Amino acid sequence: MLTNKEIRELLPHRYPFLLVDKVIELEPGKKVVAVKNVSANEPFFQGHFPEYPIMPGVLIVEALAQAAGIAVAVLEDNKGKLGVFAGIEAMKFKNQVMPGDVLTLEAEILVSKLGVTKAKVKASVDGKVAAEGEIKFAMTKA
């Protein structure tokens, strides 16, 4: 388990773009389960959509990427490196994420070589899948 402070030591993101609140399960280089508490005060709800607030799908993907990045960032070889997006594959959005939801972020590292990582990711609320697919990211020198 990682606290928010420990997450901030691994990821360069800060408010309002740090989208992982805590890590509840971590197998370095293999998998991660993390949580994003979706507050009614999130800045993106002001415009998406004021009368019917829904977390934008692209931010769900970003939250998944941040979670997956943590699984790799904790490895000694990646200390001080920055994870950057390299691709998204077969991402499907199945349910909406709304204020008050607890978004569970899961990532399983499928392969990681030559600085590029591919992960199977899933975001869910109360066991219902909100989004799932695969992402790729590269670890580069910051």
Curated annotation (Swiss-Prot):
Q: What is this protein called?
A: 3-hydroxyacyl-[acyl-carrier-protein] dehydratase FabZ
- What organism is recorded for this protein? Ruminiclostridium cellulolyticum (strain ATCC 35319 / DSM 5812 / JCM 6584 / H10)
Extract the CDD domains matched here: FabZ (cd01288)
EC number assigned by the record:
4.2.1.59
Recorded name of the encoding gene: fabZ
Gene Ontology process terms (BP): fatty acid biosynthetic process; lipid A biosynthetic process
The record's family statement is: Belongs to the thioester dehydratase family. FabZ subfamily.
What this chain does, per the entry, is described as:
Involved in unsaturated fatty acids biosynthesis. Catalyzes the dehydration of short chain beta-hydroxyacyl-ACPs and long chain saturated and unsaturated beta-hydroxyacyl-ACPs.
Which lineage is the organism of this entry classified under, starting from the top rank? Bacteria, Bacillati, Bacillota, Clostridia, Eubacteriales
Which UniProt keywords are given for this protein, alphabetically ordered? Cytoplasm, Lipid A biosynthesis, Lipid biosynthesis, Lipid metabolism, Lyase
